[in-house]
Every structure is written in C-alpha cells, then in structure tokens.
C-alpha cells in the first residue's frame, strides 16, 4: 500500500506541473525590440554663449532657419492610425464523369447453352459528380493616435520609431504598441504621419484583465479539445 502511494506522488506532481504550464500561455508579442530611445549621455560643459540674438544652446541642435521636424534619436513623432483592410476569397468546383460498358456473346458452343443461356448480355453504366464551394472574408479597421520616439537613424536618413501606450481601466489594462520606419519627408508640419506611410509597420493591441480572461479557453477544456479524436 505504501509503495502504491509513493508511486502516485510523482504522477500527481507531473500532472500538476503540466496543468500549471497549460493554465495560461501568453501570446507572442508582435512588436519586439526597444519601445523608447535610450537616455542621452550627460551633457558636456561648454563655454558660456555670448550671442545677444541667437544662442545655439537655447535651440538644441536645430539650425536657425529650419523647422523642428524630428531627425534625431529621442525626437517625438505622432502616428495617426488609419489601418483598414478588406479581403475576400471564393472558390467553386464542379466535376462530373459518366461511363458505360456493354458485354454480350453472339455465339457460344452448344455444350455451354445450359450454363450461359442469356446471362452474358450485360450492360454496365456509372457516373460520378462532385460539387464544392467555399467563401471567406475578413475586415479589419484600426483608428487612433499614438506618439512614438525615434530610436534610430538609418544611413539614408530614415527614422526608426517605436512607442507604447498603456491604459488602465478599473481592473483591466490595455496597451497599444507601434514600430516601423518612416521617411522624414512624410512627416507633416504638425509632427504627424499616417500609419499607411510607415514601412515595416508593426501594430499590436492587447488587453489584460477580467474581460481578456473570459475570452480565453480554460486549460482543462483545451486539454480535452486536443485529446479528443472528434
């Protein structure tokens, strides 16, 4: 009796570990990498500016006669999310096949009259018909705004941007993540750019909380769904 109890303990522990591992599998993130620019190095002491009208230290690294569009690491760009996709697919297949065969004996030896008689007059026919149809459609709309940070500048001048917005409501939280590459010439004077003009755009919208847990299938239900042969 003691031996059976000892043998059952590892089995129960393995089942509990398996259940804990399958309890909640977090989805893989779409946006990977840093979501903000690294902190800049501490400023070096410089000589006191003596200009009476224009002082470079008061305007950063921007020239006097150029706008303040983002061009350096750490600058801010506002992305206007205007994603809308529509996809539809339809398939129709019709096949048909007919066949026939006739077999008859016009003459046979006399000693086989009682055996054959009229049984060899055979007519065989067959047909095969198959019809199949399929249709699928998908619609996706995502609108909003998110402010990102320039995390890198490519050799050709394009900007690598990334950002995250988190919103906590009651006991749940939602976050939007965005990353991509944007041409500085696409940025408007109000420091905004449409998401449709961002290359390699990755948009992620996730939620955590009670509503997200309700939409997730339980681990035991997933186990029986995988093990079921039907």
Swiss-Prot record:
Q: Which GO terms describe its cellular component?
A: bacterial-type flagellum basal body, distal rod, L ring; cell outer membrane
Lipid modification (S-diacylglycerol cysteine), residues: 22
Q: What is this protein called?
A: Flagellar L-ring protein
Q: Which UniProt keywords apply?
A: Bacterial flagellum, Cell outer membrane, Lipoprotein, Membrane, Palmitate, Signal
Source organism, top-level taxon: Bacteria
Q: Which GO terms describe its biological process?
A: bacterial-type flagellum-dependent cell motility
Signal sequence: where? 1-21
